Regions:
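Intrinsically disordered, low-complexity terminal regions
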Residues: 1-154, 158-163, 167-173, 177-182, ...
């Protein structure tokens, strides 16, 4: 019994440490965060579960927010700098009526349970420096041309980016997957807490921290590399080219 108690306490301690590391890497991480994204979503009414034959509709919503976009709904999200000025959203009529944009957050005005159909979101073409994806979802960033790019995955979502950015900051808390191999960057700073994966190709420098079993694959080897790994995480260097 004493052994079982020690094991249980060790497990609890490890969980607390992991949560603390995740919060240190990305202060926005909150284990109680739901699709509302405010940390207290359990206090609000639930959405009605959409029927299987609920018709899809498309809505256009005015964008309210600055240079940070936070996605708190399960969705496939597309962004291009040449998109229009509004958020275009498609999905089941039963759910779309609850969709809101508040201070750069795309979320629902109710709690959603038992919903396995993703929404489709097309973000406005204004410049965003930061993209935050909470929970599940697919974030597609195309034809970027910007100085700074900050991407945070909290949960099990994934992101793919193409284009150019001078400086990339990538935070993954959970099991997210980031494909940045087709994004041309000078320098990158990557923080992974959990089992997340990332592929990237920084030309000049990379600062890497992994807590857990995360994995980073370099498609192009940076000239300057700084690493710290706590756990079973690993870094796969770019293959060397023979002369």
């Amino acid at each position: 019994m004493r052994t079982l108690g020690v094991i249980a306490l060790a497990g609890i301690g490890a969980s607390v440490v992991c949560l603390a590391i995740a919060h240190a890497i990305d202060p926005g991480v909150d284990q109680f965060r739901g699709f509302r994204g405010d940390g207290f979503g359990f206090m609000f009414r639930g959405c009605s579960t959409p029927s299987d034959d609920s018709a899809n509709i498309t809505r256009e919503l005015e964008w309210h927010g600055g240079d940070t976009v936070t996605i708190n709904v399960p969705a496939t999200i597309h962004y291009r700098p040449d998109n229009g000025p509004t958020l275009r959203a498609s999905g089941p009529n039963d759910i779309m009526s609850h969709l809101r944009v508040r201070d750069g957050r795309v979320e629902l005005d109710c709690r959603m349970y038992g919903f396995d159909r993703e929404l489709n979101l097309v973000l406005p073409g204004r410049t965003f420096d930061s993209f935050i994806l909470n929970g599940t979802g697919h974030l597609v960033l195309e034809n970027l041309r910007q100085t700074e790019l900050n991407v945070s995955l909290r949960g099990e979502g994934d992101v793919r980016a193409t284009g150019m950015a001078d400086d990339l900051t990538l935070n993954i808390a959970g099991s997210g997957d980031a494909d940045m191999g087709q994004l041309s960057v000078q320098s990158s700073k990557v923080r992974i807490a959990g089992s997340g994966k990332a592929a990237l190709a920084p030309r000049d420098s990379a600062d890497i921290f992994i807590a857990g079993s995360g994995e980073i694959r370099f498609l192009e080897q940076p000239r300057h590399l700084q690493t710290h790994i706590a756990g079973s995480g690993r870094i796969i260097n770019a293959p060397t080219t023979g002369l």
